[in-house]
């Protein structure tokens, strides 16, 4: 089983876990198993925009063999308007920044000019789809940072998002190399700081070195990119198996599916499928289009920046 498939399934499963309770206040519910319906009245196992945009990014990168922003944006267009890359031919839970950027692209605007550039354009809609870049990009850290800026900027073209996405990409890359998760975070922060540490926007991530020590009350699970990255890494560091990590994430409330997806991708990479610590088989059983996802993850090892 490829690490890419395990990581992608980790993201998809946790996304689906969070879909039924998205926007619910913290502690107003308790997810313990895969459920359905709820917020969007979807069947159990149905994944949302987090997975769709991740899979759209992966499909383009595999087919092209490199990071191609225009091709990835075209895949996003096919997802939003033609229901490709969806779980059950239904597009739902699309963030405003992503919807606006893809609509703008459809009006003939160049892909690099579609993403929001303001400080308020820092939702988690770029972060949630960065996993393939973390696992597949080859090149120098500077080249990887440039690629992440391009792909994040398709929908979220502000430095706060760029930094958060790069940290996540570096964490995933460190985990893929076999680093222990705390070491992976420390190394990722060092690598990202060499590129962006001088930027004022870096201050949005100063809690990350000590994130594990924070209490649940100090962790926010909003749709803001820095909150989502903090919450996902906190869940990863506070748990020792996939199930506990994913459930901790989706039970934080608010943006449950995206916090789950961001944490779940890393947890899937660490713990794999099945076994005592891996993604529970009863959760993957209800995920639609598993064979397509598996095929998408086969035969791709690296992509050029």
Positions of the model-derived regions?
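Structured, active/binding-site neighborhoods that engage oxygen-rich ligands
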Residues: 1-305
């Amino acid at each position: 089983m490829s690490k890419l498939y395990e990581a992608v399934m980790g993201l998809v499963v946790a996304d689906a876990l969070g879909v039924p309770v998205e926007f619910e206040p913290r502690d107003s519910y308790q997810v313990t198993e895969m459920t359905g319906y709820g917020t969007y009245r979807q069947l159990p196992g149905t994944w949302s925009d987090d997975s769709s945009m991740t899979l759209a990014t992966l499909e383009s990168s595999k087919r092209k063999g490199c990071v191609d922003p225009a091709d990835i944006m075209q895949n996003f267009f096919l997802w939003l308007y033609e229901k490709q890359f969806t779980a059950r031919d239904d597009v739902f839970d699309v963030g405003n920044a992503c919807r606006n950027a893809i609509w703008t692209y459809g009006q003939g605007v160049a892909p690099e000019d579609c993403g929001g550039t303001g400080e308020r354009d820092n939702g988690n809609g770029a972060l949630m789809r960065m996993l393939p870049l973390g696992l597949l990009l080859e090149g120098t850290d500077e080249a990887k940072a440039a690629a992440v800026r391009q792909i994040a900027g398709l929908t979220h073209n502000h430095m706060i998002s760029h930094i958060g996405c790069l940290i996540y990409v570096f964490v995933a890359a460190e985990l893929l190399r076999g680093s222990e998760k705390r070491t992976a975070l420390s190394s990722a922060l060092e690598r990202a700081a060499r590129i962006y540490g001088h930027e004022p926007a870096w201050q949005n991530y100063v809690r990350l070195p000590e994130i594990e020590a924070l209490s649940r009350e100090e962790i926010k699970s909003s749709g803001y990119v820095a909150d989502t990255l903090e919450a996902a890494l906190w869940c990863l560091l506070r748990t020792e198996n996939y199930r506990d990590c994913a459930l901790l994430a989706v039970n934080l409330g608010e943006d449950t599916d995206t916090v789950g997806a961001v944490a779940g991708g890393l947890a899937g990479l660490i713990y794999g499928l099945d076994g005592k610590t891996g993604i529970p088989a009863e959760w993957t059983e209800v995920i639609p289009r598993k064979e397509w996802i598996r095929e998408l993850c086969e035969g791709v090892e690296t992509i050029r920046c």
